[in-house]
Amino acid sequence: MNAPTPAPSPVDVIPAPVGLLAELTHRCPLRCPYCSNPLELDRRSAELDTQTWLRVLTEAAGLGVLHVHLSGGEPTARPDIVEITAKCAELGLYSNLITSGVGGALAKLDALYDVGLDHVQLSVQGVDAANAEKIGGLKNAQPQKMQFAARVTELGLPLTLNSVIHRGNIHEVPGFIDLAVKLGAKRLEVAHTQYYGWAYVNRAALMPDKSQVDESIRIVEAARERLKGQLVIDLVVPDYYAKYPKACAGGWGRKLMNVTPQGKVLPCHAAETIPGLEFWYVTDHSLGEIWTQSPAFAAYRGTSWMKEPCRSCDRREKDWGGCRCQALALTGDAANTDPACSLSPLHAKMRDLAKEEAAETPPDYIYRSIGTNVQNPLSEKAPL
């Protein structure tokens, strides 16, 4: 009699994805220096057509995806954004519009509401208009954002304000909280900059010092207590000052997938920075095939790829080793422990790097733009 085949370890079983980040376009009227989009942005001519996006959404629903984040760039720059949103509603997918609120966003909002948009997440670069427009690189953006937010709440749509925090606006954290209350937002994200994409290029310009970060955390914690039942405040702390890393994207290939404007499917925003990974496109494979069979998704899924100290750490199934892209950028090896972790031998050096950059006079922003040959000022620096 043959022995029964042992059941696979729970961490080796491929779970169903929960969320899909649909990067519909990289076009955006804002030029934020912390943008998580890649340095080489997809042009309009390379974007997926409407029918392909509708197929992708149908396949996502079939896989068990519950949430679709309609993002970019600025998703309302797509002329088919209403049709795409309507498809989400038809499939029972919860749709979250991640928007700058400028350009044509307001003009399309009522139509999006009419076809079943579920939620709006509005980026706000600052409270003071001049500062916000300096950060976003677009004049007269703030009044447009306020008009957009007002219409969102008039329609009865739940509104989340997203404020990416850095040294240029960290003093405005109390103001972001007050603004969220004033606008009738249900949720506020106080998200300290995560240094990938354009933020990595601009790290020296964006890095706050530790005392500023600690004070912002204190302010948020006090506001959470004061506004309990009125406003939910999410807080994302900067990795460079953290004790433990975040589970990037909920764990590589465990919860989320990111479809780029040209149809490349990624386990996380910055995965393309890791050399040697083979990414599959929705034009060549179904979403289900990509989720279960793509070499890129398999590369760091689970725990078998881990080195020490991650391999034997009791947190290995909590943070999944942290961010692979950050490990590569700062240590030279994507399989190393994320240096955001206090158990990494390079953790202290990461803290020192942040301290040094925060103490220096910030350089000018390198603004996000399509078609610009960006020279990364950190590219000549050796890893930690």
From Swiss-Prot:
Residues 14-230 form the Radical SAM core domain. Its cofactor is [4Fe-4S] cluster. Pfam families: Radical_SAM, SPASM. It comes from Methylorubrum extorquens (strain PA1). Keywords: 4Fe-4S, Iron, Iron-sulfur, Metal-binding, Oxidoreductase, PQQ biosynthesis, S-adenosyl-L-methionine. SUPFAM superfamilies: Radical SAM enzymes (SSF102114). Pathway: Cofactor biosynthesis; pyrroloquinoline quinone biosynthesis. One of its GO terms (molecular function) is 4 iron, 4 sulfur cluster binding. Binds 1 [4Fe-4S] cluster. The cluster is coordinated with 3 cysteines and an exchangeable S-adenosyl-L-methionine. Catalyzes the cross-linking of a glutamate residue and a tyrosine residue in the PqqA protein as part of the biosynthesis of pyrroloquinoline quinone (PQQ). It comes from the Bacteria. Belongs to the radical SAM superfamily. PqqE family. Gene3D superfamilies: Aldolase class I. GO terms for biological process: pyrroloquinoline quinone biosynthetic process. Interacts with PqqD. The interaction is necessary for activity of PqqE. [4Fe-4S] cluster binds at residues 28, 32, 35. Its EC number is 1.21.98.4. It is an enzyme of class 1 (oxidoreductase). The keyword Iron applies. This is PqqA peptide cyclase.
